[in-house]
């Protein structure tokens, strides 16, 4: 099912992240760098990622850098391949529902 608002690199930080594939590409905790999996939960300060061994890992948003994969079917119309977006975790520090509300405000005024 397509979302009403397409997920673009420019608006990813306002979207629901649960279900997206992710890789930690940098972190102040070196043991977190390189972790990859699917986001299964999100809090104000953490992303919970399920890795390929079905293990749940809690990753702090602050001081981490992530690479998200946006599947082609959720991305721009006509796009035939997945899009990869690098995001500083500090930009995600907010309760998910508040971040999602902000895109609705932007659309209203944009």
Curated annotation (Swiss-Prot):
Record's subcellular location: Cytoplasm
Enzyme class: hydrolase
Keyword Protease: no
Gene3D superfamilies: Ribonuclease P/MRP, subunit p29
GO cellular component, one term: cytoplasm
Alphabetical UniProt keywords: Cytoplasm, Endonuclease, Hydrolase, Nuclease, tRNA processing
Pfam families named among the record's database cross-references: RNase_P-MRP_p29
Domain of life: Archaea
SMART domains given in the database record: POP4
InterPro entries recorded: RNase_P/MRP_Rpp29_sf, RNP1, Rof/RNase_P-like, Rpp29/RNP1
Reactions this protein catalyses: Endonucleolytic cleavage of RNA, removing 5'-extranucleotides from tRNA precursor
Enzyme Commission designation: 3.1.26.5
Annotated GO biological process: tRNA 5'-leader removal
GO molecular function per UniProt: ribonuclease P activity; RNA binding
Function according to Swiss-Prot or TrEMBL: Part of ribonuclease P, a protein complex that generates mature tRNA molecules by cleaving their 5'-ends.
Subunit structure, interactors included: Consists of a catalytic RNA component and at least 4-5 protein subunits.
Entry's family note: Belongs to the eukaryotic/archaeal RNase P protein component 1 family.
Protein name per the record: Ribonuclease P protein component 1
Annotated organism of origin: Methanosarcina acetivorans (strain ATCC 35395 / DSM 2834 / JCM 12185 / C2A)
Upper classification of the organism: Archaea, Methanobacteriati, Methanobacteriota, Stenosarchaea group, Methanomicrobia
């Amino acid at each position: 099912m397509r979302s009403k608002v397409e997920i673009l690199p420019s608006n990813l930080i306002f979207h629901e992240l649960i279900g997206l594939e992710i890789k930690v590409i940098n972190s102040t905790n070196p043991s977190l760098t390189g972790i990859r999996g699917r986001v299964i939960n999100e809090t104000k300060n953490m992303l919970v990622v399920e890795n390929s061994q079905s293990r749940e890992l809690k990753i702090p948003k602050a001081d981490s850098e992530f690479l998200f994969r946006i599947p082609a079917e959720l991305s721009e119309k006509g796009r035939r391949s997945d899009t990869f977006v690098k995001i500083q975790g500090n930009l995600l520090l907010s309760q998910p529902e508040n971040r999602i509300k902000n895109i609705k405000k932007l659309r209203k005024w944009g």
